[in-house]
Amino acid sequence: MKKKILVGAIIALFFMPLNVFAAKGDQGVDWAIYQGEQGRFGYAHDKFAIAQIGGYNASGIYEQYTYKTQVASAIAQGKRAHTYIWYDTWGNMDIAKATMDYFLPRIQTPKNSIVALDFEHGASSDVNANTETILYGMRRIKQAGYTPMYYSYKPFTLQYV
């Protein structure tokens, strides 16, 4: 988990000055359907939640029915709320475009919050194509008024990006 956040934060630095407040040592949680409709914080000192809105996988576009209530719950508890999109593009720009077109208008977190592309499965053997779909998604996120972040893990990134 720490590697995913660190890699994403480093890549985000190359795209824009960070305008999302984060202090050294800030800790938060990664929520998906498994944490229920309200989500679950691990510790009282958690500062944020990053909730999965849904994404694209081998079956196509899907939504997480828990996303809206998890975001509302985080905000109601005074925590920062961020979004991530499962991003199995298979290096295909049409999939990347369809995913961004579908999810960007549905984001519930505040403008300037992080919107991460969770790319840890569904890669093509074409490293350049994978990289281009990620960069495309990050540009679209920025244009929509959010802070883009790449969310993955090191071995997968080294092999496919």
Indicate where each model-derived feature is located.
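Sec-dependent N-terminal signal peptides of Gram-positive bacterial secreted proteins and lipoproteins
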Residues: 2-22
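Short amphipathic alpha-helical surface micro-motifs
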Residues: 12-15, 98-99, 152
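Generic alpha-helix signal with a bias toward terminal, lower-confidence helices
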Residues: 17, 41, 93, 156-158
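Substrate-binding cleft of extracellular glycoside hydrolase catalytic domains
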Residues: 23-146
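Generic domain-boundary/flexible-linker signal
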Residues: 60, 159-161
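Aromatic-lined carbohydrate-recognition surfaces of secreted/lumenal glycan-active proteins
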Residues: 144-159
